Amino acid sequence: MTASHPADSGVCIRPAEPRDIASVVEFRSRMFRELGWTDEARLEEVAPLASAYLREQFASGGCTGFVADTPTADGAETVATVVVVWQSVPPSPRNLAGKQAYILGMYVMPEFRRRGIAKALMEAAVECATEAGVPLITLHASDQGRLLYEQMGFHSAPEMRLFTEHAARSAWRPVDDAD
């Protein structure tokens, strides 16, 4: 994919590079805070782990991504990110290839929202997965992103999950309760 420009947004969408990992990790932490994560120590603990994971995945071809940059006096500032993680799953009647893509780190800085940037990043991610022959793309939708994802054809699935680690369960509470 070559760089593209969402209409009238003043930003450039481009493929992510290893130098963008710090932005992905920072934006992912911001996303967790906005969604109600209240354990700052846990976020500080996960940041270097996420950074190492992404470095390894980018180096091995286990993921790819896209960023949105806006021009600044010094060059450009990254204002949004999305990562596509390639996953191997058991083949099934709907997925004979046993491949899927997982979208993570979809985040747009608040002052750049409602300009088509998230849509442009998601379109790039979906196009990338489609071109790679991946028959299934999954993501976890926030309330803010759900409408966009539904407009793009995503739908809810009957997935269930169980967090077995107490720390992963204990620090999550709705934003409304986070005094």
Question: Which positions does each model-derived feature cover?
Answer:
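Conserved GNAT acetyl-CoA-binding A-motif
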Residues: M122, A129-S142
